[in-house]
Amino acid sequence: LDKIVKELEYKGRAIYLPPKYMKDFKSGIVYIPKEEETEIPSVEEVSNEKTFSKNPQGILLTPPGLSLTNLFEKELGTDFLRTDLPHLQENMPKILIENLEIAQDLQMEMQGNIVNVKITDSIYKNFCQEKEKLHNICGSIGCPLCSAIACALTRATGKPITIEKDDISEDNKTITIRYRILEE
């Protein structure tokens, strides 16, 4: 994926699109624009189910964390489309810590259109450390866990989401991710 984005010279930050852009609400799409500053493609442009969008130029991919998001919903016995951010904030720790044992701790804080997530002792920590070498993935599309949370956020809010920043602590124990909820 990193090589594809690099070879096609796509420079924009990945945008996770909400379910209204898809025919199947359980699917997901992440849009990577050709240029750094760009607008979000129309619902019509995305629903054509093509890999490349023409207006604006970009690539439409299945998010790496989509299956994990669907597993989160299954574990909770809910559909994130029928929830909201406070519900997600309350239940994501239960899923990741108790149900799936993916992390030792998860904190989710909302500040306006910013969602900050802090994950401690994740089973993905080594993966995150390695993926930092993949500049087109780290901090844009994200690892499967960061991507899964972005998919859950876009379902719960009904709005596009970007991963603004992700960091892993020096001791490799804590992953901090900042998501932005976009207006269309």
List PLM regions with ranges:
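Short, surface-exposed ligand-recognition loops at beta-strand->loop->(often short) alpha-helix junctions
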Residues: 81-86, 140-144
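N-terminal topogenic membrane-targeting module
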Residues: 1-71
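Short, hydrophobic/π-rich interface segment
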Residues: 120-168
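Acidic/polar low-complexity scaffolding segments in large eukaryotic proteins
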Residues: 72-77
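Short terminal or interdomain "cap/linker" segment that borders an active site or interface and mediates
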Residues: 116-117, 160-184
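Beta-strand-connecting loop/turn residues
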Residues: 36, 111-115, 173
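An N-terminal amphipathic alpha-helical segment
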Residues: 52-66, 89-131
